[in-house]
Amino acid sequence: MKLSHLDEKNHPKMVDVGDKNITSRIATASGMIYMSQEAFDVIKNNTAKKGPVLQTAIIAAIMGAKKTSEIIPMCHPLMLSKVETDIMEFVKECAFKLIVTVKCEGKTGVEMEALSGVSIGLLTIYDMIKAIDKSMRITDIVLESKEGGKSGKFVRS
């Protein structure tokens, strides 16, 4: 399989999407963060010294999706039409699951924007609570689904 981000001399390049059709693109990614009971309670009770953790993580996830092309070298800048987030609590596991869905009308997909949003959102939780629990674990950052473009639809099974 030939990688599209490498030229004939094996040098990195940004893929030319100029001839592609503009289509509706949507992608959803998710990830988990596990923590101590104390850290989980601080977040749930909204008593973190740095402020409202989950609300800040949502804003960070949106910013992370929007800034993807600035931090991942071969990503194209995209005009996003939607970034939607959801956070699920897992009380028994002392964990949160962050889900980010990104949409645009464009010539390339938004998978990296969804994955970046999840990553930055979870890193923000870690940053805001690390004084309480440095052993937090960020895991299972995955693409859940994507639609649009030549490669069609993908849904994680």
From Swiss-Prot:
Main EC class the enzyme belongs to: lyase
Source organism, top-level taxon: Bacteria
SUPFAM superfamilies for this protein: Molybdenum cofactor biosynthesis protein C, MoaC
Keywords: Lyase, Molybdenum cofactor biosynthesis
GO biological process: Mo-molybdopterin cofactor biosynthetic process
InterPro entries: MoaC, MoaC_bact/euk, MoaC_sf, MoCo_biosynth_MoaA/MoaC, Mopterin_CF_biosynth-C_dom
GO molecular function: cyclic pyranopterin monophosphate synthase activity; GTP 3',8'-cyclase activity
E.C. designation(s): 4.6.1.17
Residues annotated as binding substrate: M74, C75, H76, M112, E113
Pathway where this protein functions: Cofactor biosynthesis; molybdopterin biosynthesis
CDD domains: MoaC_PE
Listed Pfam families: MoaC
Residues forming the catalytic site: D127
Reaction(s) this enzyme catalyzes, per UniProt: (8S)-3',8-cyclo-7,8-dihydroguanosine 5'-triphosphate = cyclic pyranopterin phosphate + diphosphate
Family: Belongs to the MoaC family.
Purpose of the protein: Catalyzes the conversion of (8S)-3',8-cyclo-7,8-dihydroguanosine 5'-triphosphate to cyclic pyranopterin monophosphate (cPMP).
Subunit structure: Homohexamer; trimer of dimers.
Protein name: Cyclic pyranopterin monophosphate synthase
